[in-house]
């Protein structure tokens, strides 16, 4: 037999580019045709091998002992004899010839193997999902389990060859379209035994094994969490923060901090997020002087069904202090996290969360710029994007609007900022809008209903950061004044003309009509003028509320629907 067997036009792990696969007594290797990193697998690491039909011909699936599942696609049917002979002689492994279920049924039996979840129909695999491709799983209903797949960040999609070992767990990134979620409907009950999960429908004639009967969907969910290592071992949890309010996505979550990831545990959804996915870390004080916001920029973004959340926004109380001791050995703390983490914390919760996130993720904490202070001495300016109210923060190198929709703009990408008035004369005198136009036709962002008092602080910040801006409000003011003057001239001329035409009416003596009731005029107005109430002082009161909201804002829950009437602010205890 030859010392090596080579195969051309082979695709590794759904890679875009083919490569050359070579088998030898020491192991196997794959190198992309266009050049790049070579993938190798030692012969001692090969546990089993399977041969089956696949997308580009025939596929050789290798179940390794420590590297999960390796897929080699693109073989011809004639290659099976050479492959099976090489595996038998060099690795002592029989290549199993497997046939897939082609009936198209969407019901079958799930089997948890060592490296993947298999969905079998009539004892044949319909599809398999490697555990390394599963990023998260949730109980979507009483009998329904949602499985989410790993996504590739926009910036790293082409960072490595698709067959690279550094891309392990991101096979779907090779294609322009990728499956992001799959749901399993699992009715009934089941019992977990040493041999696996035994459902109530299994009829194998064996004696019933001891085990606690529970909901089949719950047992499937817990088993998948364990196999896919979504929920890490409790002993590996460095720190836990309970019942933390999140504005985006909305809800309260427990935060478990691990070595390379953190987990959000809510009543309905659980999320596992790698620290490597954190691209930006913001610490932003709210205007109510009672809360602070911690904002994490994520890439790839967090997913909840069809909704994507590129920013994670949590809200913490400034006066809430906690005492926390890290669940970490002194050796690990000294060797890996020296000068990054402390063994014990006893200070406000927002500082503890920030310090631990910074120590474990290694990300720099970004805070509001010292070059901007609002008219009322705050770091954020109250405004809105369409119907969503929030706070706009001015940082040294960027702008960010939170909580919903969280919007991030880098200053270096800003072409010009336009300050303008929108609306009638009353609203124009109290608020204004700013439109941020981006360079190279990247679009624009409009922030509305900014208090008129913030104009000067904003202009000073734009000048300090050398941001080009236009103030269109001065032109609007001149136009309003000119219109008012013209209107006064017309009214005075009308009065003169009117008195000249009255004739003998000027000689009439004015007297009080004793039968006249003052309320009758308003009654007539209400009957014939549908806008009688809205045209009076009510609009002025509403505008006063709008302009004063930034002053009196205390415990405002900004993630609620803005269409609802504003509630009275709460006073912290």
From Swiss-Prot:
Other remarks in the entry: In contrast to the orthologous protein in animals and plants, this protein does not contain a HMG box DNA-binding domain. This function may instead be provided by the HMG box of the associated nhp6 protein in the FACT complex of fungi.
UniProt cross-references to Gene3D superfamilies, sorted A to Z: 2.30.29.150, Pleckstrin-homology domain (PH domain)/Phosphotyrosine-binding domain (PTB) (2.30.29.30), Structure-specific recognition protein (SSRP1) (2.30.29.220)
The keyword DNA damage belongs to this UniProt entry's keyword annotation: yes
Residue ranges, annotated region (Disordered): 153-174, 485-573
Name by which UniProt lists this protein: FACT complex subunit pob3
A biological-process GO annotation: pericentric heterochromatin formation
Role summary: Component of the FACT complex, a general chromatin factor that acts to reorganize nucleosomes. The FACT complex is involved in multiple processes that require DNA as a template such as mRNA elongation, DNA replication and DNA repair. During transcription elongation the FACT complex acts as a histone chaperone that both destabilizes and restores nucleosomal structure.
Record keywords, A-Z: Chromosome, DNA damage, DNA repair, DNA replication, Nucleus, Transcription, Transcription regulation
Biased composition (Basic and acidic residues): 496-505
Name of one Pfam family that matches: POB3_N
SMART domains: Rtt106 (SM01287)
Quaternary assembly: Forms a stable heterodimer with spt16. The spt16-pob3 dimer weakly associates with multiple molecules of nhp6 to form the FACT complex.
Top-level taxon of the source organism: Eukaryota
Organism: Aspergillus fumigatus (strain ATCC MYA-4609 / CBS 101355 / FGSC A1100 / Af293)
């Amino acid at each position: 037999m030859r010392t090596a067997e080579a195969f051309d036009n082979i695709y590794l792990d759904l890679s875009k580019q083919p490569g050359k696969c070579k088998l030898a007594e020491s192991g196997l290797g794959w190198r992309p045709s266009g050049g790049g990193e070579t993938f190798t697998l030692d012969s001692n690491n090969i546990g089993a091998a399977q041969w089956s039909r696949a997308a580009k011909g025939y596929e050789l699936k290798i179940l390794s002992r420590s590297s999960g599942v390796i897929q080699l696609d693109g073989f011809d049917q004639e290659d099976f004899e050479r492959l099976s002979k090489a595996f038998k002689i060099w690795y002592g492994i029989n290549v199993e010839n497997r046939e897939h279920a082609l009936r198209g049924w969407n019901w079958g039996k799930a089997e948890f193997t060592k490296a993947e979840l298999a969905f079998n129909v009539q004892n044949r695999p319909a599809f398999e999902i490697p555990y390394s491709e599963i990023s998260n799983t949730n109980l979507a209903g009483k009998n329904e389990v949602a499985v989410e797949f790993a996504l590739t960040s926009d910036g790293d999609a082409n960072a490595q060859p698709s067959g690279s070992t550094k891309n392990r767990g991101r096979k779907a990134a090779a294609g322009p379209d990728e499956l992001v979620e799959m749901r399993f409907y699992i009715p009934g009950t089941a019992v977990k035994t040493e041999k696996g999960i035994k459902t109530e429908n299994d009829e194998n004639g064996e004696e019933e094994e001891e085990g606690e009967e529970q909901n089949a969907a719950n047992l499937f969910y817990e088993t998948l969490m364990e196999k896919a290592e979504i929920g890490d071992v409790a002993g590996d949890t460095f720190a836990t923060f309970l019942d933390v309010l999140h504005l985006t996505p909305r809800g309260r979550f427990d935060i478990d901090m691990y070595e390379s990831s953190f987990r959000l545990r809510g009543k309905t959804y659980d999320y596992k997020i790698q620290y490597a996915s954190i691209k930006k870390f913001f610490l932003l004080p709210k205007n109510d002087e009672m809360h602070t916001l911690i904002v994490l920029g994520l890439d790839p973004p967090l997913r909840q069904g069809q909704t994507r959340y590129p920013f994670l926004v949590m809200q913490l109380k400034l006066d809430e202090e906690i005492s926390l001791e890290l669940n970490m050995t002194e050796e690990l703390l000294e060797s890996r996290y020296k000068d990054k983490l402390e063994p014990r914390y006893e200070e406000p919760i927002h500082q503890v969360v920030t310090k631990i996130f910074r120590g474990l993720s290694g990300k720099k904490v970004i805070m509001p710029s010292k070059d901007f202070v609002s008219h009322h001495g705050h770091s954020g300016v109250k405004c809105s994007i369409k119907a969503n109210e929030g706070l706009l923060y001015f940082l040294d190198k960027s702008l960010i609007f939170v909580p919903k929709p969280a919007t991030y703009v880098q200053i270096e990408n800003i072409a010009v900022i336009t300050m303008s008035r929108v609306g009638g004369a009353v609203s124009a005198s109290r608020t204004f809008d700013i439109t941020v136009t981006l360079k190279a036709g990247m679009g624009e962002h409009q922030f509305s209903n900014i208090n008129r008092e913030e104009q000067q602080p904003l202009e000073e910040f734009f000048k300090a950061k050398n941001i080009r801006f236009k103030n269109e409000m001065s032109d609007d003011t001149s136009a309003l004044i000119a219109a008012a003057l013209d209107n006064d001239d017309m009214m005075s001329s009308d009065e003169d003309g009117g008195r000249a035409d009255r004739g003998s009416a000027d000689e009439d003596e004015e007297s009080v009509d004793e039968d006249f009731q003052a309320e009758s005029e308003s009654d007539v107005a209400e009957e014939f003028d549908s806008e009688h109430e809205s045209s009076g002082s009510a609009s002025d009161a509403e505008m006063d509320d709008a302009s004063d909201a930034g002053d009196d804002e205390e415990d405002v829950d900004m993630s609620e629907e803005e269409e609802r009437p504003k509630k009275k602010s709460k006073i912290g205890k």
